[in-house]
From Swiss-Prot:
It comes from the Bacteria. This is Small ribosomal subunit protein uS4A. It comes from Bdellovibrio bacteriovorus (strain ATCC 15356 / DSM 50701 / NCIMB 9529 / HD100). GO terms for molecular function: rRNA binding; structural constituent of ribosome. One of its GO terms (biological process) is ribosomal small subunit biogenesis. One of the primary rRNA binding proteins, it binds directly to 16S rRNA where it nucleates assembly of the body of the 30S subunit. With S5 and S12 plays an important role in translational accuracy. InterPro entries: Ribosomal_uS4, Ribosomal_uS4_bac-type, Ribosomal_uS4_CS, Ribosomal_uS4_N, S4_RNA-bd, S4_RNA-bd_sf. SUPFAM superfamilies: Alpha-L RNA-binding motif (SSF55174). Pfam families: Ribosomal_S4, S4. Belongs to the universal ribosomal protein uS4 family. Gene3D superfamilies: Ribosomal Protein S4 Delta 41, Chain A, domain 1, RNA-binding S4 domain.
Length: 208
């Protein structure tokens, strides 16, 4: 798990985009980014001109923070994406999207990716009928994710299911909240990825 040492609301403002790190709060008028949509700090509202390198760095940081992965993990995904038989940027996003913690969140069983990581680590989910407590596991087509029977009444999971109506489940996943399950119908395409990131700039950053 990536270590975050500053306010998660400041991260959204720094990257100039909602990263949805605080779950339900991000959809309300209490969202810090909605009230102050500019970078934190004394010169946050100043108009700065960024170099190409700085823009590439910001896109990389944005993606890392959106999915909550460490630099070491991110570099690993970039390396694997370079070896994939498709566009490197698309492969990178596919790896990030199919992480178990991201899938748990996207299916609507956690209020944020950070919360999803905690729930997975604490053995609240099954993958194809077996306990899965590694957030970075990559799911495949046909995999079934299930909330452990003993965890179905947890307040966090119940509140997440109630709040999921605010965001739709993408076509590559199928959620059955009545049965506390989710199925990977297919692997995601680029158009299935909601994060507003320029993946080509990330590839260029690591190609230096």
């Amino acid at each position: 798990m990536s270590c975050i040492n500053e306010s998660v609301c400041k991260l959204c403002r720094r990257e100039n985009v909602k990263l949805f790190l605080k779950g339900d709060r991000c959809y309300t008028d209490k969202c810090s980014f909605e009230r102050r949509p500019y970078p934190p700090g004394q010169h946050g509202q100043s108009r700065l001109k960024f170099s190409e390198f700085a823009l590439q760095l910001r896109e990389k940081q944005k993606a890392k923070r959106y999915y909550g992965v460490s630099e070491k993990q991110f570099v690993k995904y970039v390396g694997e994406a370079n070896r994939a038989k498709e566009l490197t940027g698309h492969a990178l996003l596919k790896f990030l999207e199919t992480r178990l913690d991201n899938v748990v969140y996207t299916l609507g069983y956690a209020n944020s990716r950070r919360e999803a990581r905690q729930l997975v680590k604490h053995n609240h989910f099954l993958l194809n009928g077996k306990r899965a407590n590694i957030p970075s596991i990559l799911v495949n087509k046909g995999d079934v994710i299930q909330v452990a029977e003993s965890s179905r009444e947890m307040a966090k999971i119940q509140s997440a299911i109630q709040a999921v109506a605010r965001r739709s489940v993408p076509a590559w996943l199928e959620a059955d909240h009545a049965k506390f399950t989710g199925t990977v119908k297919d692997l995601p395409n680029r158009e299935d990825v909601a994060v507003a990131v320029e993946e080509n700039m990330i590839v260029e950053y690591y190609s230096r």
